[in-house]
Structures are given as C-alpha cells and as structure tokens.
C-alpha cells in the first residue's frame, strides 16, 4: 500500500518536472535552440535541453593562399605628376656637316682637296650632293654639271628627267636643273665651257656669271658677259631664255626647237649652241642637231667632248 503510493508520487513529480522544463524552454526560445525529445515512448523518453551557444573559440590557423585571380582591365591614366627638377646639361653636340662642310668644289680645293673626281658637297638646304670636281683646269675648283664624252647616254630626254638629272659618273651626265639652280643661287658663279673635237683640239668659252632660275621660272638662264675663249661666244644669244625639252616647249619659235634639233636647251628661235644635242661624231650632214657651238665649228660639226662647269666668282 505504502509502495504504491510512493510510485504514484514519483510519477507525478517526473511529469511536473517535464512540464517545467518545457515551460523554461519556451521562455528561452528567442535566445536558445529548441527542446529535443529522444527515446521511444512513455516513461522511456528522454528530454535533452540544448544549451545556449558558448563563447567563440580561439581563431584557427591561417589557411593557405588561394591562386591568383585574372588580371583586371587597365584603368584610365591618372593625372600628370608634377614636373621634376631640371636635369644636368647634356654634352655639346657635333656641328652638322652641312653647316661646316664644303658648299662647292672651290671650297674643297681651298681645304686641300687637289684631286679631280667625285666629291660630296652640301647645298644651302643641307642636302648632300655628289658632284664631279675639276681641280686641274684654269686653277681648279670647278663643279661640272654637264659632260659629253662618248655618246653612251641619250640626252634627248623629257622635262622631269632634266629636272632630276641623269647619266653615269663613269661617263656622261646632266646634274639636274634643280641642282644647277641650287648651286648657282648661292652667289655669283662664273661659267666655263670646254670643248674638244675629234682631232683632240681644245676650245673654251668663259662667262663672267651664270645662274639658272628655279622651276617656277622655267629654269630661266641669267648669263653675264662673255669674258674670253677660243671657242667664241655662242651662249649670249640664249640669255634670259627658258629651258625647253621635247615635252615642254618654252622657246620663241612657232615649233618646238627641242624636237627639231633633238636636244634640250635654253632655245630662243632656235639656237647658236646645242650642247645637249645628238652625239654625231664630228662632221654631220644634218643641220644643227648635234653637239654644236656655232662660233666654234659651226652647225654641222658635233664635238667629241663637251663640259659645262661653274665656280664661285
């Protein structure tokens, strides 16, 4: 009897504790996890109350670095920084060759170059130009701009070719109207014409001054007085005349003198000299279309050698 009563009291106490635990769990639901019941059934069930989270533990060891990500796009440049202090002065520069180099073959001669041949000079625009220098004739220092010696080069050319120049350093050439203009625009230049016939007789003609205008003025010839020469004067007639070629007729004739006499020259109406005519090797039956100098050997004789050259006066 007493035993049954004790069992009943114990069961009631257990049930009361269960209700109190559930009530406390509900009250703490906002801060702690839910109550969890485990077991099978009846009085065998166990009530587990999960406590509130404890204090954070100590940090764990640092993990290994991950792999590098892809490189991002380059951003816009930032604003320029402030200028730094001036740097030290550089070493003195070398003078440009065109400022100190020779301008003519006469300059070369004055600097001790006594051998005739091809040399480099510098035009007023600092452009280098390789020219044939005659250091032997009449005191030397002559710049040769026209040479005929063997007929190896055709001189019956168009305007553009005469403008640029043509021929060979080994033989015949025309230096080019642009180059002749640049050479004679530097100051007063005297002109010498040397002629040799097929019997090796020499003739020459000298003029006090010689200048060729630029292309805009059709390479107009500006010639000074005839000074001397065994060949006589066959160029004054052409003074103040424009240059003409087979494709650009600037003469005073109704026809084209360059075509009629197969050359290129400062034709008037038409010529008394034609040093850029055909290489006809001495006496020829055709009229005035050879390397002719009328006051020398007339219209029907073509010279073996012709050279035109300038030197500062």
Curated annotation (Swiss-Prot):
Protein's cellular compartments: Secreted
Where is composition skewed (Pro residues) in this entry? 76-89
Signal peptide range? 1-25
Q: What is its main location?
A: secreted
Q: Which residues are glycosylated?
A: 240, 300
Q: Name one Pfam family in it.
A: Collagen
Q: Record's superkingdom?
A: Eukaryota
Parts forming coiled coils = none
Q: Which UniProt keywords apply?
A: Calcium, Collagen, Complement activation lectin pathway, Disulfide bond, Glycoprotein, Hydroxylation, Immunity, Innate immunity, Lectin, Metal-binding, Repeat, Secreted, Signal
Alphabetical GO CC annotations of the entry are: blood microparticle; collagen trimer; collagen-containing extracellular matrix; external side of plasma membrane; extracellular exosome; extracellular region; extracellular space; serine-type endopeptidase complex
As for what it does, the entry says: May function in innate immunity through activation of the lectin complement pathway. Calcium-dependent and GlcNAc-binding lectin. Enhances phagocytosis of S.typhimurium by neutrophils, suggesting an opsonic effect via the collagen region.
Q: Which proteins does it associate with, and in what oligomeric form?
A: Homotrimer. Interacts with elastin. Interacts with MASP1 and MASP2. Interacts with CR1.
Q: What is the protein's given name?
A: Ficolin-2
């Amino acid at each position: 009897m007493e035993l049954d009563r004790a069992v009943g009291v114990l069961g009631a106490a257990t049930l009361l504790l269960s209700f109190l635990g559930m009530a406390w769990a509900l009250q703490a639901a906002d801060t702690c996890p839910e109550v969890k019941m485990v077991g099978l059934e009846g009085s065998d069930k166990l009530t587990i109350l999960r406590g509130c989270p404890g204090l954070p533990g100590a940090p764990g060891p640092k993990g290994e670095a991950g792999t590098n990500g892809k490189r991002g796009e380059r951003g816009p440049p930032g604003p320029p920084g402030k200028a730094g202090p001036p740097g030290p002065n550089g070493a003195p520069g070398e003078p440009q060759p065109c400022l100190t180099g020779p301008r003519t073959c006469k300059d070369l001669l004055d600097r001790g170059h006594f051998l005739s041949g091809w040399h480099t000079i510098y035009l007023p625009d600092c452009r280098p130009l390789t020219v044939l220098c005659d250091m032997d004739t009449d005191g030397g220092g002559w710049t040769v701009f026209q040479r005929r010696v063997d007929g190896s080069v055709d001189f019956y050319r168009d305007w553009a070719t005469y403008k640029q120049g043509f021929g060979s350093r080994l033989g015949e050439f025309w230096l080019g109207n642009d180059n002749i203009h640049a050479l004679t625009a530097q100051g007063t230049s005297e002109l010498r014409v040397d002629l040799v016939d097929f019997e090796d007789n020499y003739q020459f003609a000298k003029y006090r001054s010689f200048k060729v205008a630029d292309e805009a003025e059709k390479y107009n010839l500006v010639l000074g007085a005839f000074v001397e020469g065994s060949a006589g004067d066959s160029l004054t007639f052409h003074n103040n005349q424009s240059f003409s070629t087979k494709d650009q007729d600037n003469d005073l004739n109704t026809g084209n003198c360059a075509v009629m006499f197969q050359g290129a020259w400062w034709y008037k109406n038409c010529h008394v000299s034609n040093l850029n005519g055909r290489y006809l090797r001495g006496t020829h039956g055709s009229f005035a279309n050879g390397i002719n100098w009328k006051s020398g050997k007339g219209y029907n004789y073509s010279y073996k050698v012709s050279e035109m050259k300038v030197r500062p006066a």
